[in-house]
Amino acid sequence: MRVMGVDPGLTRCGLSMIESGKGRQVIALDVDVVRTPADTPLQKRLLTISDAAEHWMDTHRPDVIAIERVFANQNANTAMGTAQAGGVIALAAAKRDIEVHFHTPSEVKAAVTGSGRADKSQVTEMVTRILALQAKPTPADAADALALAICHCWRAPMIARMAAAEAMAEEQRRKFQAKIKAARG
């Protein structure tokens, strides 16, 4: 499975591409950070991010895109910009019929470090080890994008099992409702 990891942001938007293998084997294919100046109009910044993400999608052909879920407990302006950046990337994926999954920061940290409360340096260190990189990815947005892709590779089987279980439960509920309706006649 080929996963594009996205650490959304207006000033710096991390993009990564990971290929998963057997078990927990993951290989880094590419990583970059798209930068937009704060003094550039919002629509131009979003266009720059969208263009870069679309180029990545068309070049690398990911099977799925993993985007960090935004929380509003940050600065409101920062949260809004981060959500907008993630939104244009999700839209670009939808236009290409690429599945999108959102992961919380604590899910990502727990997946790569074992602790949902890990700091950025711990995440960067583990990403470097997991991917057997020669140097730590910089800036932190690059490491976070890689961590998001790793997280999705490792969580995807569980996500698929949960979706299958939910579908089965819904089918059983539907059949039960049909039986009740038939019995009432």
Curated annotation (Swiss-Prot):
One of its GO terms (molecular function) is DNA binding. It is found in: Cytoplasm. The active site is at 7, 68, 141. The keyword Cytoplasm applies. It comes from the Bacteria. Binds 2 Mg(2+) ion per subunit. The keyword Chaperone does not apply. Keywords: Cytoplasm, DNA damage, DNA recombination, DNA repair, DNA-binding, Endonuclease, Hydrolase, Magnesium, Metal-binding, Nuclease. Its main location: cytoplasm. GO terms for cellular component: cytoplasm; Holliday junction resolvase complex. Its cofactor is Mg(2+). Signal peptide: none annotated. Mg(2+) 2 binds at residue 68. One of its GO terms (biological process) is DNA recombination. Its EC number is 3.1.21.10. Pfam families: RuvC. It is an enzyme of class 3 (hydrolase). It catalyses: Endonucleolytic cleavage at a junction such as a reciprocal single-stranded crossover between two homologous DNA duplexes (Holliday junction). Mg(2+) 1 binds at residues 7, 141. Belongs to the RuvC family. Homodimer which binds Holliday junction (HJ) DNA. The HJ becomes 2-fold symmetrical on binding to RuvC with unstacked arms; it has a different conformation from HJ DNA in complex with RuvA. In the full resolvosome a probable DNA-RuvA(4)-RuvB(12)-RuvC(2) complex forms which resolves the HJ. The RuvA-RuvB-RuvC complex processes Holliday junction (HJ) DNA during genetic recombination and DNA repair. Endonuclease that resolves HJ intermediates. Cleaves cruciform DNA by making single-stranded nicks across the HJ at symmetrical positions within the homologous arms, yielding a 5'-phosphate and a 3'-hydroxyl group; requires a central core of homology in the junction. The consensus cleavage sequence is 5'-(A/T)TT(C/G)-3'. Cleavage occurs on the 3'-side of the TT dinucleotide at the point of strand exchange. This is Crossover junction endodeoxyribonuclease RuvC. The lineage of its organism: Bacteria, Bacillati, Actinomycetota, Actinomycetes, Mycobacteriales.
